[in-house]
Amino acid sequence: MTGGWDESAQAWIASLGDEGDWGRRHVLDAPMRARLGDRGFRRAVDIGCGEGRFCRMMRAAGLDTVGIDPTTALIDRARALDPDGDYRVGRAEALDLDDASCDLAVSYLSLVDIDDLDAAVGEAHRVLEPGGIFLIANLQSFNTAADPIGWDHGPDGTRRFSIDHYLQVRPVWIAWRGIRIRNWHRPLSTYMESLLDAGFTLRHFAEPMPYGVEGEKADRYRRVPNFLLMEWQKST
């Protein structure tokens, strides 16, 4: 890679722990699992699986899964936590899978890390069987456009969320708890055009809100949704 991931892998593992971070636990997990539902998915690829957290959730739901990530330390951790799982070091832009070999592809907060978006989307399309689903959770584009401004205060002292250069595709480095990684800011139109051009059809779009928790952080997430969730289908 690395985009900071090789250097940050151990801090990432420590930060997520066994339960995952706040956004996953209180915003994304429930709607992501709801999209799995009882829909008869058989084989899923988790693109950018990290330490394998969502792969383990899908396996617990009865799916055969393949987790792929370019960071060796994260794949090592995934294998340690799930010795019977299938975890592979690899890149989203060149998946080690046969054509039409999966009926579900998942990107759980990983598209924002990938350098070549079009190549990754094209690979997801390639490995899906006709009618297969590409389930995506990603950072909101206005969230990635906020760096380094984000939350500040207006002239009257009211707290507000500011963004700038929204249409400019660019790398954004973020750091917290010993982690320093490169995300990519892309306007939402860039993601949409890439997915449409690859041959996907949008079937679901949501901006999930926090659940099961209150407080200042939850209030901020309700004012400015941090994430989006999309489901795209390959044509039959």
What role is predicted for each listed range?
Residues 1-39, 53-57, 74-77, 134-169:
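Conserved class I S-adenosyl-L-methionine
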Residues 104-116:
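A short SAM/SAH-binding and catalytic strip from SAM-dependent methyltransferases
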Residues 171, 183-205:
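Short alpha-helix
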Residues 93-104:
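A short acidic, Gly/Pro-enriched loop at the edge of an enzyme's catalytic core
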